[in-house]
Amino acid sequence: MTLKHPLQGEGGLMDFENLHQVLRTLYTEMMPLVGNMTGIAKGVAGLGALFYVASRVWQSLARAEEIDVYPLLRPFAIGLCIMFFPTIVLGTINSVLSPVVKGTNQMMAAQTLDMNKLREQRDQLEREAMLRNPETAFLVSNEEFDKKIDEMQGLNPKHLVTITSMYLERGMYNLKKSMQDAFKSFLEILFQAAALIIDTIRTFFLIVLSILGPIAFGIAVFDGFQSTLTGWLSRYVSVYLWLPVSDLFSTMLAKIQTLMIGKEIAALENPAYIPDGSSVVYIIFMLIGIVGYFVIPTVAGWIIQAGGMGNYGKNINQTVQKSGAVAGAGAGAVGGNVLGKLRK
């Protein structure tokens, strides 16, 4: 699975998908390294089991009590998990959580497909609306532009002024579209980069937790370190859930855009409506998506409590708030100035 999202352009999309796939391949290729830690973990767990069993047996003998065998099975159960860590532990967790990932990915794919269909319908209706208006038809159609030029052939000064004005207006329209497309492409790159950053951090965390997992299980055998086992499990599940949370966030953005595009289509179906061709709403959602991707770790932490991730979540949220404020202010100022000048 890859971290996909609905707010994405066609150019360069394949490159980003390849990078996400590289991260998936990296996780798979790094899993054999778990075996290198198994031997060390066995030694740690064996030493811990020796102290654990000896302590429990000595306490029972000192108190002249019967030896309770059931608690003594804990080190052996953990040792069994260490011996078959990739299969019993990682395989079980990934198998249980995989349907969640697939379910959220299907939700996102369905919403994105509906949004893309509505977007194509909106673009077609917008073009038809501009073609219906004689004052804007020549801006989007070369045939209409050539037709108006042919109607004003001659040396009439009035026609020359009109033709010059048409060329200038068409040039400004094309310049406006080009600048809007360039600004959208820039935001799309930032959006893709945000998704790639989250995916890279997620993959790194999963690899570290997977490779060093046997060591964590071995340490958990010792008295006083029992919480290491539950801490490792909660952190692994929390990081693993970053992907379905990301898909749910993308699904929400796609649904909101679907509703917005639906309203635009309803307005464009009115013959009296004249579209302005601006992409302000799209740009706003791009900015929301860029900042929103960095709160995914916090939301995943709400699903399952992972105490050790608190500092990371706090730091990354503070960093995002600062950088988001600066980036949002800069992008808003630039976008506002550009769109303001173009509308004039």
What spans do the regions from the language model cover?
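N-terminal amphipathic/basic-hydrophobic helices that include classical n-h-c signal peptides
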Residues: 1-13
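Histidine (H) residue identity feature
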Residues: 5-6, 20, 159, 312
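Short, charged juxtamembrane terminal tails flanking transmembrane helices
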Residues: 339-344
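Membrane-interface interhelical loops and short interface/amphipathic helices
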Residues: 99-170
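Hydrophobic alpha-helical segments involved in membrane association or supramolecular assembly
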Residues: 11-121, 169, 173-337
